[in-house]
């Protein structure tokens, strides 16, 4: 009996803090996850819903605007090395592939599309609208490749 009461007391000690805050507080305390790269070059590919390519391109335009207005010194470097191309032909399922090519990678810079937009767009309703547009356009992330430059044939 003494052992059971000890176990119950221990559980109560751990559970009370978990229930003492609202869910909003728990989510608000979590910092958004950064997307960083360690290689010299990064390539990311996303399949976009065919009827939402204009929405995706609006999000990319907002990303460019956010980085260009940012006071962070690495933002200008990110702009200089971040290119986005659109595949000319659709995938068999109709989705359109967008490839992000980042060269050179700015070490420790955040390459999260939404984090960078949120740094510029402070209104929660507008943030939600941009996120919904981004999420609605995205069929799936295909891959991320990063690594060192092995050969630069232009030199």
What are these language model-derived features?
Residues 1-4:
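Positively charged n-region of N-terminal signal peptides that target proteins for export
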Residues 8-25:
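Bacterial N-terminal signal peptides
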Residues 27-39, 68-98:
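Short, glycine- and small/hydrophobic-rich beta-strand elements in well-ordered beta-sheets
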Residues 37-50:
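Acidic/histidine-rich, surface-exposed loop or edge segments in extracytoplasmic proteins
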Residues 41, 53, 57-60, 64, ...:
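Extracytoplasmic/secreted envelope proteins and their assembly/folding machinery
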Residues 48-50, 60-62, 88, 100-106:
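A mature extracytoplasmic/lumenal domain signature
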Residues 64-80, 94-95, 101-155:
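An amphipathic, aromatic/His-enriched active-site/gating alpha helix that lines ligand/cofactor pockets
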């Amino acid at each position: 009996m003494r052992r059971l009461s000890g176990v119950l007391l221990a559980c109560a000690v751990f559970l009370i803090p978990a229930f003492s805050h609202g869910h909003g507080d728990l989510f608000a305390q979590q910092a958004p996850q950064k997307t960083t790269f360690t290689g010299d070059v990064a390539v990311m590919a996303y399949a976009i819903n065919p009827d939402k390519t204009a929405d995706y391109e609006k999000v990319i335009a907002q990303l460019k605007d956010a980085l260009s207005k940012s006071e962070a010194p690495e933002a200008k470097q990110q702009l200089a090395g971040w290119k986005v191309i659109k595949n000319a032909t659709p995938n068999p399922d109709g989705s359109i592939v967008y490839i992000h090519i980042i060269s050179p990678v700015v070490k420790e810079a955040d390459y999260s599309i939404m984090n960078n937009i949120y740094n510029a767009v402070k209104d929660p309703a507008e943030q939600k609208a941009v996120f919904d547009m981004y999420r609605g356009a995205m069929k799936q992330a295909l891959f991320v490749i990063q690594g060192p430059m092995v050969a630069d044939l232009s030199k």
